[in-house]
């Protein structure tokens, strides 16, 4: 009995052990594919694991739920091959330079090369001609490079940074070259003039102004020079001279940047856009600085011009302003002001009684004096005042 019972127990225990082994083998077979890593394809990395990142040098990368770009979750922006250029999340490129361990931001640019050129300009101004640049450094042997070096030497670091941020550096550089060339006659012209027995005067830097086509004038309103910081362009002129491609959905237009040159050769950069809310074309960014520097007030006239086709400036835009001041007594010329009435005096008991009325500004704080001046003739009022002063003596 004992031996048979032991055999039964061994048989039962052996069967249960076999079942357990089979169950463990099946479980291992099911979980084995999930534990495989690097089987000739891309590795599967848990995105929720902190610090997990695929190798940038691997052939590919699989992210759960779809493909990821360079700026995707857990990814890094591509570095630039240029010095002083940093990528932006929106696909644009930024430029920066360090001055005394402080970062100086030079602006954001559409292309990587444009940002690299902006850095080179700042490096030439901040660190001199020996600065390390991305492209070929400026040299005195090249006339264009020498002109740019001269331009940088006459501008402060803050001015150069401001021009780079507003994307007006190359426009102002071109204007500086034209002005310098106009004020300095060439050697050939000087030699030819001397051979003819006379020296011709250099061409005025503002001579191309005669080759401009007048577009339109705008009389600024109080809101144009107020706190709204915008200039409304009349719709008929805006659609004719500055057409914009408006969004089909009727939304707000981001607009474009327009460069205008004033009479002094300074380049002004304005953002020109369409406001769907007010259905108007406006100049916004940069306009408040123009108003402040030019001293514009309501009633002044701003003129817009474009270079003529024969000038060869490819439709260059110009801006001018005419200040219209009040013709009141405070600003009137001395010839327009009436001559003061002669002062008459009457001598009574050894005292000179003046007949000239008191100035109005002296009576501004006295209501009785103002009422007296309004109801009493000037001579009678002056005589009465003198009599009162005499009685009080």
From Swiss-Prot:
GO molecular function: DNA binding; DNA-binding transcription factor activity
SMART domains referenced in this protein's UniProt entry, alphabetically: AP2, B3
DNA-binding region: 81-136, 216-327
Listed InterPro entries: AP2/ERF_dom, AP2/ERF_dom_sf, B3_DNA-bd, DNA-bd_dom_sf, DNA-bd_pseudobarrel_sf, LEC2-like
Primary location class: nucleus
Pfam families per record: AP2 (PF00847), B3 (PF02362)
Keyword DNA-binding: yes
Keyword Nucleus recorded: yes
A single cellular component GO annotation: nucleus
Assigned keywords, A-Z: DNA-binding, Nucleus, Transcription, Transcription regulation
Record localization: Nucleus
Residue span of region Disordered: 49-79
Compositional bias ranges of the Gly residues kind: 57-75
PANTHER family on file: AP2_ERF AND B3 DOMAIN-CONTAINING TRANSCRIPTION REPRESSOR RAV2 (PTHR31140:SF1), B3 DOMAIN-CONTAINING TRANSCRIPTION FACTOR ABI3 (PTHR31140)
Name this protein carries in UniProt: AP2/ERF and B3 domain-containing protein Os01g0693400
High-level lineage: Eukaryota, Viridiplantae, Streptophyta, Embryophyta, Tracheophyta
């Amino acid at each position: 009995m004992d031996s048979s019972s032991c055999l039964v127990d061994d048989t039962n225990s052996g069967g249960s052990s076999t079942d357990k082994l089979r169950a463990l083998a099946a479980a291992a077979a099911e979980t084995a594919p999930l534990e495989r890593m690097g089987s000739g394809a891309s590795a599967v990395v848990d995105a929720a694991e902190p610090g997990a990142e695929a190798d940038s040098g691997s052939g590919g990368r699989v992210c759960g739920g779809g493909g990821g770009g360079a700026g995707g979750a857990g990814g890094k922006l591509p570095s630039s091959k240029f010095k002083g250029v940093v990528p932006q999340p929106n696909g644009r490129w930024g430029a920066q330079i360090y001055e005394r361990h402080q970062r100086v931001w030079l602006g954001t640019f559409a292309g990587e090369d444009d940002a690299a050129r902006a850095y080179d300009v700042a490096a030439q101004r901040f660190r001199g001609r020996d600065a390390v640049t991305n492209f070929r450094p400026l040299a005195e042997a090249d006339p264009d490079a020498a002109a740019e070096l001269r331009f940088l030497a006459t501008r402060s670091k803050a001015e150069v940074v401001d021009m780079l941020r507003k994307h007006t550096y190359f426009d102002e550089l071109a204007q500086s070259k034209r002005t310098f060339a106009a004020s300095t006659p060439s050697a050939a012209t000087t030699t030819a003039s001397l051979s003819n027995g006379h020296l011709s005067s250099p061409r005025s830097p503002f001579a191309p102004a005669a080759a401009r086509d007048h577009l339109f004038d705008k009389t600024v309103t109080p809101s144009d020079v107020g706190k709204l910081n915008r200039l409304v362009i009349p719709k008929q002129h805006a659609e004719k001279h500055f057409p914009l491609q408006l969004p089909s959905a009727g939304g707000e237009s981001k607009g474009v940047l327009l460069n205008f040159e004033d009479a002094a050769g300074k380049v002004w950069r304005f953002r020109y856009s369409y406001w769907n809310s007010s259905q108007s074309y406006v100049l916004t960014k940069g306009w408040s600085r123009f108003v402040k520097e030019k001293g514009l007030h309501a009633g002044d006239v701003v003129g817009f011009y474009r270079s003529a086709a024969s000038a060869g400036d490819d439709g260059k835009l110009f801006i001018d302003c005419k200040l219209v001041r009040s013709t009141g007594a405070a600003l009137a010329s001395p010839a327009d002001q009436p001559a003061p009435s002669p002062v008459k005096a009457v001598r009574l008991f050894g005292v000179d009684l003046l007949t000239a009325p008191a100035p109005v500004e002296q009576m501004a704080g006295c209501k009785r004096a103002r009422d007296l001046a309004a109801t009493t003739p000037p001579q009678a009022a002056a005589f009465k005042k003198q009599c009162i002063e005499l009685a009080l003596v």
